[in-house]
């Protein structure tokens, strides 16, 4: 056989094997209605017992809390306490169109999107619904940057990490259909040098790719709440409208979390205790988790004492090292209407991550979408090009606005661009956006045939015309900054937690959510946090199994001595 023929056969076999591997790793969900089977074990907190006991009490039914609960329920009794409502109360969260709609709805204290303004003066939001932020976000799904694992302070089992991603993906992650504006965006990224072209991939790699979505191809949202369906319904109970006010501690043997106090929507107090070998696991998110620890007396001693909060354990870094990835952007108003699209195409570089989507016009500003309420609104269809600074290195802190009421959101400050490396990365990212705007792919969307970044009808602050003027770009970055809604930190591994996510100095208390790391794990982090809940759940099951085997071996040894 000729060498050329043999080479061709080997190439075909290689591609075939790669396809099989790819298909096996990325076994994704199929389009379906949002699965509410879990409603059979979900209750309003008013219907829960005033005092109950469980193996595990999970505070927060969000992006990490739901997969964590489902996993632990495979063997143990689990109670999930979620302060928000069921998604069925707000059907608009279940559609792609609902992303903007829910940001537009006034916050009445019950809506799934809770509004807050950081002390930086930037509008922001957090989830207040079962499923957490995974049910109000833009639906972008990606696996984490693999480089974060070695720097995390956690001894990861990478085979288990990958298996856990698949567990999530085969239920709520979809390969998106082709969308016209996303195709234009992909062409522009490649023309602007964001290489290589990865095609469709869930992996975080430098270059341009189509990534996964938690919106299926009918526009139905899928989210963390559906992962509850993978649990053991006989062992799992979910309480909504349950505001956890404090963690209960005992001192024998050693400082130990023994349960929580929570109130239902009528203001009635309830207590949920954990059984022997059980745990309280806080998954209330970057804002809610450090807030609850502080209210429970776990935090900086002098600070807690100044608020007359009894100090249970001095933990100086609770509420510290709070980060938020800045979002800077450009909006263009094309001369002709464009169809609305969700984000499915990503441009990944070392220092910044970028994407674009197209939208219909609106007359009510979506809260947090633009830097402030005074930002101009689009009167026609528009395209939004966003750049996210990786990391970031800048950080702030969280403090209590109320020393007794968990329903009062705390003060947060992120100190955007206080670290000049972040500012430099923003400048580089926005220059890349300038290169995108200068591509042939985007010429049809100009209103005038002008060179470079000129010729577009820009909504809001325009990019500097001179791509070499770093000072002008720095000013642009500071003046146009908004939140990417990817805030994180406040209860870091290595500062507050050990490598198994246990709060150091306290038995039977863990934290599993976005408060645990000082950097964003990917361009869009929900994939990592969904994985994290399942991963830690499996690790806990393994710990319990190993402990039980050790006890059994001890009993066998004792019995053999007697005999």
From Swiss-Prot:
Protein name listed in UniProt: (R)-mandelonitrile lyase 2
Instruction: Give the E.C. number(s).
Output: 4.1.2.10
Q: Which residues are glycosylated?
A: 145, 162, 379, 419
Upon changing residue 524 to N, the result is: Loss of 95% of the catalytic activity
In this chain, substrate is annotated as bound at 355, 484
The UniProt entry, under InterPro entries, shows:
FAD/NAD-bd_sf, GMC_Oxidoreductase-Related, GMC_OxRdtase, GMC_OxRdtase_N, GMC_OxRtase_C
Give residues annotated as binding FAD. Answer: 63-64, 82-83, 129, 133, 137-140, 244, 485-486, 514, 525-526
The record's account of how the chain is modified after translation: Glycosylated. Deglycosylation does not affect the enzymatic activity.
State whether it acts alone or in a complex, and with which partners, per the record. Monomer.
Regarding protein family, the annotation reads: Belongs to the GMC oxidoreductase family.
- First and last residue of the signal peptide: 1-27
Q: What class of enzyme is it?
A: lyase
One GO-annotated biological process of the protein: nitrile metabolic process
Which reaction is catalysed here? (R)-mandelonitrile = benzaldehyde + hydrogen cyanide
Q: Which GO terms describe its molecular function?
A: flavin adenine dinucleotide binding; mandelonitrile lyase activity; oxidoreductase activity, acting on CH-OH group of donors
Names of the cofactor(s): FAD
For this protein, the record's PANTHER family field holds: GLUCOSE-METHANOL-CHOLINE OXIDOREDUCTASE N-TERMINAL DOMAIN-CONTAINING PROTEIN, OSJNBA0019K04.7 PROTEIN
Functional pH dependence: Optimum pH is 5.5.
């Amino acid at each position: 056989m000729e060498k050329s023929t043999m080479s061709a056969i080997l190439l075909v076999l290689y591609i075939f094997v790669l396809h099989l591997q790819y298909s096996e790793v990325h076994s994704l969900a199929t389009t379906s209605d949002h699965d509410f089977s879990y409603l059979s074990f979900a209750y309003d907190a008013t219907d829960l017992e005033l005092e109950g006991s469980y193996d595990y009490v999970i505070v927060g039914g969000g992006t990490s809390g739901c997969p964590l609960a489902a996993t632990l329920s495979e063997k143990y009794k689990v109670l999930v306490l979620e302060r928000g409502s069921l998604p069925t109360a707000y059907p608009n969260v279940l559609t792609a169109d609902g992303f903007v709609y829910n940001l537009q709805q006034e916050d009445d204290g019950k809506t799934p999107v809770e509004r807050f303004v950081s002390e930086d003066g930037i509008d922001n939001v957090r989830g207040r619904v079962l499923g957490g932020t995974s049910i109000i976000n833009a639906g972008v799904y990606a696996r984490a940057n693999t480089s974060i694992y070695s720097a995390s302070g956690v001894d990861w089992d990478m085979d288990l990490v990958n298996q856990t991603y698949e567990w999530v993906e085969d239920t709520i992650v979809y390969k998106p259909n082709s969308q016209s504006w996303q195709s234009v965006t992909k062409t522009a990224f490649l023309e602007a040098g964001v290489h290589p072209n990865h095609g469709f991939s869930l992996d975080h790699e430098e270059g341009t790719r189509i990534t996964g979505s938690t919106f299926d191809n009918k526009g139905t949202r899928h989210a963390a709440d559906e992962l509850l369906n993978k649990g053991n319904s006989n062992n799992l109970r979910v309480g909504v409208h349950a505001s956890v006010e404090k963690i209960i501690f005992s001192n024998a043997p050693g400082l130990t979390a023994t349960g929580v106090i929570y109130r239902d929507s009528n203001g009635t107090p309830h207590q949920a205790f954990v059984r022997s070998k059980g745990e309280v696991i806080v998954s209330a998110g970057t804002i809610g988790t450090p807030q609850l620890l502080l209210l429970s007396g776990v935090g900086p001693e002098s600070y807690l004492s100044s608020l007359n909060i009894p100090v249970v354990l001095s933990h100086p870094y609770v509420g510290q090292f709070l980060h938020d990835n800045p979002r800077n952007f450009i909006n263009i108003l094309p001369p002709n209407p464009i169809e609305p699209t969700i984000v499915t195409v990503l441009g990944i570089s070392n220092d910044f991550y970028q994407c674009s989507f197209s939208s219909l016009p609106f007359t009510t500003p979506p809260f947090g979408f633009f830097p402030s309420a005074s930002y101009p609104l689009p009167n026609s269809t528009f395209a939004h090009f966003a750049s996210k600074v990786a990391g970031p290195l800048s950080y702030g802190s969280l403090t209590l606005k109320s020393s007794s009421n968990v329903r009062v959101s705390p003060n947060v400050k992120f100190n955007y661009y206080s670290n000049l490396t972040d500012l430099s990365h923003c400048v580089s990212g926005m220059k890349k956006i300038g290169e995108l705007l200068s591509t042939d792919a985007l010429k049809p969307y100009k209103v005038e045939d002008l060179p470079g970044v000129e010729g577009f009808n820009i909504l809001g602050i325009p990019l500097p015309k001179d791509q070499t003027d770093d000072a002008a770009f720095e000013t642009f970055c500071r003046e146009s900054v908004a939140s990417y809604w990817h805030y994180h930190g406040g209860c870091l591994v290595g500062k507050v937690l050990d490598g198994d996510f246990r709060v150091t100095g306290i038995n039977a208390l863990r934290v599993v959510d976005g408060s645990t790391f000082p950097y964003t794990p990917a361009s869009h982090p929900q994939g990592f946090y969904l994985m994290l809940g399942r991963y830690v759940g499996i690790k806990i099951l393994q710990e319990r199994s190993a402990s039980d085997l050790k006890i059994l071996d001890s009993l066998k040894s004792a019995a053999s001595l007697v005999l």
